[in-house]
Structures are given as C-alpha cells and as structure tokens.
C-alpha cells in the first residue's frame, strides 16, 4: 500500500469536494479546480475526508495511487490558501514592472520582454527587482515562474538573470589573469 496514497485527505470547512466518476472538482473561497484521475484509481468523499483507493497492486496502480492523492490535496490547498512563487531579478539595469495584464522585463536584450499572465495567475511586483507569481493551481504557478526564469537564466560568473527567491546560483571563478 502506498504510504502517501493511503492517507485520507481532510476537507477543511468552506471547501466542497465532489467526485463524479473519474472527475474530482474542488470548490473553495479562492476558486474552483477540477482534476481527471487515471482509470484504475478511485476517489470518494466520506465524513469530511477524501479517500483514494486502488483496485490492485499492479505497478501502474501503485504509482498512480500516491500521485492522485497528492494532486487532490494540492487542489484543496490551492482553493483555500493559494500558491505563490517568488522571483528575483539580479543585474545592473535589469528590472520588472507591471503592465496591462502582465509584466514587462528589461533583461539586457535590445527590447523589453512582455509576459502576459495566463488565466488564473496574477503577478505582484515589489520594487524593480522582485516579483511574485500568485494563483490557485500549483502546477500552473510553477510553470509560469519557470517560463519567466527561462527568459534569462542566472549565469554562473556574475549571477545575473532571473532566479527563484532564495535560490543559490552556483558560481564559477573567472579566467585567471596573467
């Protein structure tokens, strides 16, 4: 039995979880998320808890059991508290500013880079070199932050670029002078 999958998921007050076949819908104060679970796995709501079960001990069922339980738990956390991912912009002249429904970056290119917020995602900017990606879908928040970081990854010599808040960038020594 999966150690993660067998744990029941507590449903907090103000959150409604409904299971319709293979579709799980989670509604809460911050919004609504839906999830389609893989075929052999079953989910059911009992006594304010969500129980995830699997029919057999085949390899595929075992691997999907804990995954499904974690995805449902992430959706419950998302609609109650939400998810955030902080980004820092490091470098001389590198900056970020809110513009329309997205953010505009100056990252040393010959042109500014504009990133529009996907549906369900919002950006907050603190100063000119810190920003936060906010949303209820953990996967979408992480993917959006990764796409922004990908525009200008931190380089190893000076550390310039977009990095996650608190990320350690491995630094290299430069060329040794004569």
Curated annotation (Swiss-Prot):
<dbReference type="InterPro" id="IPR002358">
    <property type="entry name" value="Ribosomal_uL6_CS"/>
</dbReference>
<comment type="subunit">
    <text>Part of the 50S ribosomal subunit.</text>
</comment>
<dbReference type="GO" id="GO:0003735">
    <property type="term" value="F:structural constituent of ribosome"/>
</dbReference>
<dbReference type="GO" id="GO:0019843">
    <property type="term" value="F:rRNA binding"/>
</dbReference>
<keyword id="KW-0699">rRNA-binding</keyword>
<keyword id="KW-0694">RNA-binding</keyword>
<dbReference type="InterPro" id="IPR019906">
    <property type="entry name" value="Ribosomal_uL6_bac-type"/>
</dbReference>
<dbReference type="InterPro" id="IPR036789">
    <property type="entry name" value="Ribosomal_uL6-like_a/b-dom_sf"/>
</dbReference>
<comment type="function">
    <text>This protein binds to the 23S rRNA, and is important in its secondary structure. It is located near the subunit interface in the base of the L7/L12 stalk, and near the tRNA binding site of the peptidyltransferase center.</text>
</comment>
<dbReference type="InterPro" id="IPR020040">
    <property type="entry name" value="Ribosomal_uL6_a/b-dom"/>
</dbReference>
<dbReference type="Pfam" id="PF00347">
    <property type="entry name" value="Ribosomal_L6"/>
</dbReference>
<dbReference type="GO" id="GO:0002181">
    <property type="term" value="P:cytoplasmic translation"/>
</dbReference>
<dbReference type="GO" id="GO:0022625">
    <property type="term" value="C:cytosolic large ribosomal subunit"/>
</dbReference>
<keyword id="KW-0689">Ribosomal protein</keyword>
<dbReference type="InterPro" id="IPR000702">
    <property type="entry name" value="Ribosomal_uL6-like"/>
</dbReference>
<protein>
    <recommendedName>
        <fullName>Large ribosomal subunit protein uL6</fullName>
    </recommendedName>
</protein>
<keyword id="KW-0687">Ribonucleoprotein</keyword>
<comment type="similarity">
    <text>Belongs to the universal ribosomal protein uL6 family.</text>
</comment>
């Amino acid at each position: 039995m999966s150690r993660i999958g067998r744990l029941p998921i507590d449903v907090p007050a103000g959150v409604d979880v409904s299971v319709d076949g293979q579709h799980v819908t989670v509604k809460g104060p911050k919004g609504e998320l839906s999830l389609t679970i893989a075929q052999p796995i079953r989910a059911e709501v009992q006594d304010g808890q969500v129980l995830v079960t699997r029919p057999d001990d085949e390899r595929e069922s075992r691997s999907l059991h804990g995954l499904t339980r974690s995805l449902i738990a992430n959706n419950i956390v998302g609609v109650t508290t939400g998810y955030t991912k902080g980004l820092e912009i490091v470098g001389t002249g590198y900056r970020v500013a809110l513009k329309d429904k997205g953010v505009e970056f100056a990252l040393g290119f010959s042109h500014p880079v504009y990133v529009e917020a996907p549906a369900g995602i919002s950006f907050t900017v603190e100063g000119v070199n810190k920003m936060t990606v906010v949303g209820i879908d953990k996967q979408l928040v992480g993917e959006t932050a990764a796409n922004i970081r990908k525009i200008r990854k931190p380089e190893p010599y000076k550390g310039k670029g977009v990095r996650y808040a608190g990320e350690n960038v491995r630094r290299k020594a430069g060329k040794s002078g004569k």
